[in-house]
Structures are given as C-alpha cells and as structure tokens.
Swiss-Prot record:
Cross-referenced InterPro entries: GHMP_kinase_C_dom (IPR013750), GHMP_kinase_C_sf (IPR036554), GHMP_kinase_N_dom (IPR006204), Homoserine_kinase (IPR000870), Ribosomal_Su5_D2-typ_SF (IPR020568), Ribsml_uS5_D2-typ_fold_subgr (IPR014721)
The organism's place on the tree of life at top rank: Bacteria
Keywords: Amino-acid biosynthesis, ATP-binding, Cytoplasm, Kinase, Nucleotide-binding, Threonine biosynthesis, Transferase
Compartments it resides in: Cytoplasm
E.C. designation(s): 2.7.1.39
Protein name per its UniProtKB record: Homoserine kinase
Recorded catalytic activity of this chain's protein: L-homoserine + ATP = O-phospho-L-homoserine + ADP + H(+)
Pathways per UniProt: Amino-acid biosynthesis; L-threonine biosynthesis; L-threonine from L-aspartate: step 4/5
Enzyme class: transferase
Main location per the UniProt record: cytoplasm
Gene (name only): thrB
Length: 311
C-alpha cells in the first residue's frame, strides 16, 4: 500500500493573486491536510473517511479523486483495479486549498503506484489541470506549494514554472476557518473583469516589492507589501465578519498583517513574535468562528510539501 499526505496551503498571501502560495503545518504537530492511500484490489473502489468526509460528493463521477485516477489512466494508457482511500481533513470550499490537498495526494500516490511514470513537472501540470475541473480555471497557487512545499511563485508562461521564495523563519501564520463555505467559483465571480491602470501599477509594485524583500531579507518591507488590491475589496463581503474590523483588532493585539486565505472564508493573521499568538488565536475563536466546524490553527511554513508516509 502507498499512503501520501498533502498539506493545506494559503493561496495569494494577500499580495500575489493566482501567483503566490505557501504550504502550512500546525506548530503543535497536528496534520492539517489530506491522506490518500492506494493498493491492489479485485475491483475499483474509493472509500472516504476523515473529519470532513461528509462534504465529499457521493456520486463517483463528481469525486475529484476518481477524476484524478481516471485522467491518469488515460495518460498512462493503463487501467488497474485499485482501492483508493481518501482521509478528508481539510474542509471543502474553505480557502485552505482543500481540492489541492486531495488532488496532490491522489496523483502522487497514483503516480508512485504506477512506477513514477510522470516527473515532477508533468505531475504539477496535471495537478493544475485537475484543479481547473474543481474551481473552473487552471491555477497553481495551491497545488504547487502543496506538492513541493515552501512559499512559491508560479510562472505559467515559462518552463521553470514553480519557483521557491525564501520566507522568514520567525513568521507565524494563524489561520481561522469560520465553519462556512465559500466556493472558489463564487469568489471568482465577484471579481471585476478589468482593473484600472493604477491598480495594475500598484499590484505590480506590491508583488515585486514583496519578492525582492524576501530575497534580500528585508522583513519590514515584505510585511508592508502584503496588500491585496485585486481580490480583497470584492471578496471581503463574502466573509461572515467585517475584515477591516478583524484586521484592526488583531493588529492592536500585535499582528503585523491579516488577509483572506485563497478565496476565503478562512483568513490568515501574520505574527512575527510568539508572545501575541495565544491572545490573537483566542480572540479569533470567540469572534470569527460561526459554528462548531470552525477552527483556529497556529501554523508555520511547511517546507516539505506532499510526502509518502507509513501506516
């Protein structure tokens, strides 16, 4: 049996719409991600378990794990009866790269089972293709960091598509999932089709400034450049609590940045000192979570990405 773990991720990181993403892991050692296992069987089957198993479509044709297996069989021209198990631990439509977790874990497991027919570049392209079947458009800001780990920028027009961006070791990422769904399709539909020239200039300056600051180890400049002028002004209305209010409160408590994780409704809060983390986490649990499905996790950068695990 082959078993693969794929971690949750924060797409966009405020400043890099459809371009930046980072893989995350809870600092307490918990697993925030999906597991997929595959083994020989007489007949094909998919079994679902995990904290959010009930959010997975019942019909096989709608299951992204099945779609990954079917597409891989088409590419490899091989069809083998297998048993695939998905342990779904990242909520669907949460802004934490839930579909990417399932896609990455599935394709890494399937590719390994088939003798690694595809290299990493080919796998990544296939992951982006499968992500497009879920969200309605091909993008890599979740699948790339989920697969390869770290903070990454995706350059779709060039051969070396996924590039690692150095982060800061003292950065702590608090993520707060309120327990409600916001689909990627819906969150993309609220975005304008065109942006002003000034918005384009500002976006380019923020993103290039952030990348430059990360490479030159200018932490303050990097923090100052985490500004979302592309998605946040339009997606903030989809959140259950006013984002400006949240940002103001967490910054008063010592956070250095706050924004929407991916398409939302999860938000991220960035801290660069440890002594403010507990207070901010407790406050978010009280004022942002909407039901018992919501959670707050204190995370750090996951540098490994997907991994073949034992058991």
């Amino acid at each position: 049996m082959i078993r693969v773990y794929a971690p949750a991720s924060i797409a966009n990181i405020g400043v890099g719409f459809d371009t930046l993403g980072m893989s995350i892991s809870p600092v307490n050692g918990d697993k925030l991600g999906d597991f997929v296992s595959i083994k020989d069987a007489d007949n094909f089957s998919i079994k679902i378990s995990g904290l959010f198993y009930d959010q997975i479509p019942i019909k096989l044709e709608q299951n992204i794990v099945f779609k990954c297996w079917k597409r891989f069989c088409e590419i490899s021209n091989q069809i083998r009866p297998v048993e695939i198990k998905l342990e779904k631990n990242v909520p669907v439509e949460s802004g934490l790269g839930s579909s990417a977790c399932s896609i990455v874990a599935s394709l890494v497991a399937i590719n390994n089972y088939y003798g690694n027919l595809l290299n990493n570049d080919q796998l990544l392209q296939l992951m982006g293709e499968m992500e497009g079947k879920v969200s309605g458009s091909i993008h890599f800001d979740n699948v790339a960091p989920c697969f390869l780990g770290g903070m990454r920028i995706f350059l779709s027009k060039y051969k070396n598509t996924s590039q690692l961006i150095p982060s800061f070791d003292n950065w702590i990422w608090i993520i707060a999932y309120p327990g409600i769904k916001v689909s990627t399709v819906k969150s993309r539909s609220v975005l304008p089709k065109q942006y002003s020239l000034q918005d384009c200039v500002d976006y380019g300056q923020y993103l290039s400034g952030f990348i430059h600051a990360c490479h030159t180890r200018q932490e303050l400049l990097a923090i100052q450049c985490i500004e979302d002028i592309i998605a946040e002004p339009y997606r903030a209305k989809l959140l259950p609590v006013d984002l400006s209010f949240l940002r103001s409160c967490v910054k008063e408590k010592g956070a250095v940045s706050c924004g929407i994780s991916g398409s939302g409704p999860t938000i991220f809060v960035l801290c660069n000192v440890k002594n403010v983390v507990d207070d901010i986490s407790n406050w978010l649990s009280r004022f942002y979570l909407q039901n018992s499905s919501g959670f707050v996790k204190v995370c750090s950068l996951n540098k490994l990405g997907s991994d073949i695990v034992l058991g």
